[in-house]
Amino acid sequence: MDKKSARIRRATRARRKLQELGATRLVVHRTPRHIYAQVIAPNGSEVLVAASTVEKAISEQLKYTGNKDAAAAVGKAVAERALEKGIKDVSFDRSGFQYHGRVQALADAAREAGLQF
């Protein structure tokens, strides 16, 4: 089993549990150059809010889009957009990535901006 398939296996198990609970999910995806965050409806078929370092509004404020500062900016942006839509409580779906570094920075920034998970 390679690294990617192991991550996908971990992510699938967590997603299945969150779907059983019927929770709104804050999903994080990380690449070496960018980080993406989406708030997904409990049924899993609708993206309610999204933010990423690919967006011009976020990437213009940053020197580099693949570090903790960029992740924190995305976390703050996704939390503000979720609160505008009336979404306060979410479940954090780390997509099989280790809760460390950029993933943790995004989560901490989202919590500071007002999301609860």
Swiss-Prot record:
Against Gene3D superfamilies, the record matches this protein to: 3.30.420.100
A single Gene Ontology CC annotation of this entry is: cytosolic large ribosomal subunit
Which top-rank group of organisms is this from?
A: Bacteria
* Keyword Ribonucleoprotein in record: yes
**Which UniProt keywords are present, listed alphabetically?**
Ribonucleoprotein, Ribosomal protein, RNA-binding, rRNA-binding
Q: Name one GO molecular function term.
A: 5S rRNA binding
Could you provide one GO biological process annotation from this protein's UniProt record?
translation
Its biological purpose: This is one of the proteins that bind and probably mediate the attachment of the 5S RNA into the large ribosomal subunit, where it forms part of the central protuberance.
PANTHER family, per this entry? Answer: 39S RIBOSOMAL PROTEIN L18, MITOCHONDRIAL (PTHR12899), LARGE RIBOSOMAL SUBUNIT PROTEIN UL18M (PTHR12899:SF3)
Subunit architecture: Part of the 50S ribosomal subunit; part of the 5S rRNA/L5/L18/L25 subcomplex. Contacts the 5S and 23S rRNAs.
Q: What family name appears in the similarity comment?
A: Belongs to the universal ribosomal protein uL18 family.
Identify this protein by name: Large ribosomal subunit protein uL18
Which gene name does the record give? rplR
